Amino acid sequence: EFTFGEMQMIVRSVATPGHTPGSTSLEVDGKYLMTGDAVFVTGIGRPDLGGETEPWARDLFHTIHDRLAPLDHDLLVCPAHYTSRTEASEDGALHRQLGDLLENDPIVSMGDEEEFVKYVVDHLGTPPDQYGDIRKVNLGIIEPDDEMLKELEVGRNECALTA
């Protein structure tokens, strides 16, 4: 539980491995699910960027079905990135109800693990060009300047796999 001035919020961590082994989502006040790159408004985070595509795809399948599916389906999934502004709601917000994502997203709703893994492996394409730089920044190996940060963060989301 956190207090900011007069505002209090309850934050609960949910391990959501798949995009990366340490991926963690945050449930905030029982209303929002900050998913980082685990799942997006449409699609999932790529499980291949660490070179362990099939095992991480299996982790992601179990994240969806064993960790996210039991949560309140009214939670609003708020990912770290978006692929297109068309994913925004009428008020411009980039979120989607968890239940809608689980039931209607063509990838997230796949109920068979082998089908899911095969689909993911067969549809990934090449990793994003900037991934090497992103990894070096995340590990503290390089210190990005403002221009590099803008390029890495503002560019289109290439860490997602959508149907």
Model-derived features with residue positions:
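Catalytic core of the metallo-beta-lactamase
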Residues: 1-79, 85, 162-163
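Accessory terminal helices/loops
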Residues: 62-163
